[in-house]
Amino acid sequence: MIKLFNSLTNKKEPFVPIEEGKVKMYCCGPTVYNYIHIGNARPPIVYDMVRRYLTYRGYDVTFVSNFTDVDDKIIRAANELGEEVAAVAERFIKAYYADTCALNVKEADLHPRVTETMDDIIAFIADLEKKGFAYEAGGDVYFRTRKFNGYGKLSGQALDDLQSGARIEVDERKEDPLDFVLWKAAKPNEISWSSPWGEGRPGWHIECSAMIKKSLGDTIDIHAGGKDLTFPHHENEIAQSEALTGKKLANYWMHNGFVNINNEKMSKSLGNFVLAHDIIQQYSPEVVRFFMLTAHYRTPINFSDELLKGAEAGLERLKNTVANLQHRLAETADMGAEEEWLEKIAGAKQRFIEEMDDDFNSANAISVLFDLAKEANIYMSEAQTSKKVLNAFLELFAEFGEVLGVSFTQQEEELLDAEIEALIEERNVARKERNFARADEIRDLLKEKNIVLEDTPQGVRWKRGS
Ligand SMILES: Nc1ncnc2c1ncn2[C@@H]1O[C@H](COP(=O)(O)OP(=O)(O)OP(=O)(O)O)[C@@H](O)[C@H]1O
Ligand SMILES: [Zn+2]
């Protein structure tokens, strides 16, 4: 049985879905105004692993993750670049897909966008207002936090501690400093939507509440996101949704730890970040993903060249074992002692499942993989081997690889479509910024990989050369 650490109760709990065999899962997605750094890539990678494992264990998973495609940061970026908000958002949504696809993150079943969910967001706020949980003030709408019983239950904070906390801004339009914004009145010349409270746009927290309700219903099984989202974002999502429906928003809350660099959280505001699309040029995307999964998702992971090189070497060892198994298979007849080895392989599978059942411990599951490789190497040193055993080893590597989203078979060094598109996008940006040196460098890199670019009036086209 799968157990997972529920941030709501601070305990590891057996996973019991609302509907047998089905999982409704939501993960807060990115605000699309720049490229993702490797810290931002951790939530998509680890929750993709969780989704894959739940699927492996027989659940039918519906996975939803949003795009925040209008917000202060995007508006600021658009103003700086002299572009439309929609153009900036579109570009970075493409870049997000390109990076996460290279990292072998499966697309969500649904990727709702704020700008496409506006009617539902407005209806959600209007219903909160009707119930007395929201009030209008000068074109803004706020949530009446103290009216919601249970505010603070996720982050474990009492209302009065929050009140004195420095993170709450004081704004005289609010009835109470704890109240937070649901709808923001538009500033002059700012992108806006019509609403019962005038022209404006939604606050950040309300989007997720409205999108979850629309796409998955009132109560979902798992709500996931980075640890920094616990407060205020997730606390506010709970308040909005539960005030409206009277039902629990999510039965299980999962929060991933940070990617640190020199023991400090990697973040855009600190400027200590490494972009995902840069690091996957230096190491393969597979190595980056494997590296990420060598730590348990809740523990902080330090980002360093040394650790990445370690992950690269480890992955190489596993791939070599698999290549040797394949090679051996081609020249083996069916003979040798089978039962003992088949039992060993079945035992490894059992241990892998036990580790993953225990709060998705991919770190320990990967050490089971290394043990499996060790066993495989011992087996191959025997004089006589059997096709059946070699196949059983290979099947298990393939099975684990599918769960982790990392392939252990050797591949030609070929660029994936998504990586090519990411590079072309980066070249477009470089050209726009008149950074022609970088633009040429990218053209050369693509040429080296036999990708031919063609500038057309409709934009850049590409094809693989012969
Ligand atoms: N270092 C990190 N490790 C793991 N997850 C992270 C890290 N930084 C951000 N995230 C996650 O990435 C997503 C986007 O976060 P956000 O845009 O706040 O990134 P950021 O770099 O921290 O930006 P800022 O410094 O502007 O807050 C969130 O889900 C957040 O939890
Ligand atoms: Zn959210």
UniProtKB/Swiss-Prot annotation:
A motif ('HIGH' region) lies at residues 30-40. InterPro entries: Cys-tRNA-ligase (IPR015803), Cys-tRNA-synt_Ia_DALR (IPR015273), Cys-tRNA/MSH_ligase (IPR024909), CysS_C (IPR056411), Rossmann-like_a/b/a_fold (IPR014729), tRNA-synt_1_cat_dom (IPR032678), tRNAsynth_Ia_anticodon-bd (IPR009080). One of its GO terms (cellular component) is cytosol. A motif ('KMSKS' region) lies at residues 265-269. Gene3D superfamilies: Cysteine-tRNA ligase, C-terminal anti-codon recognition domain, HUPs. Its cofactor is Zn(2+). It catalyses: tRNA(Cys) + L-cysteine + ATP = L-cysteinyl-tRNA(Cys) + AMP + diphosphate. Binds 1 zinc ion per subunit. ATP binds at residue 268. Zn(2+) binds at residues 28, 208, 233, 237. One of its GO terms (molecular function) is zinc ion binding. CDD domains: CysRS_core (cd00672). Its EC number is 6.1.1.16. It comes from the Bacteria. The keyword Endoplasmic reticulum does not apply. The modification Phosphoserine is found at residue 269. One of its GO terms (biological process) is cysteinyl-tRNA aminoacylation. Belongs to the class-I aminoacyl-tRNA synthetase family. Monomer. This is Cysteine--tRNA ligase. It comes from Shouchella clausii (strain KSM-K16).
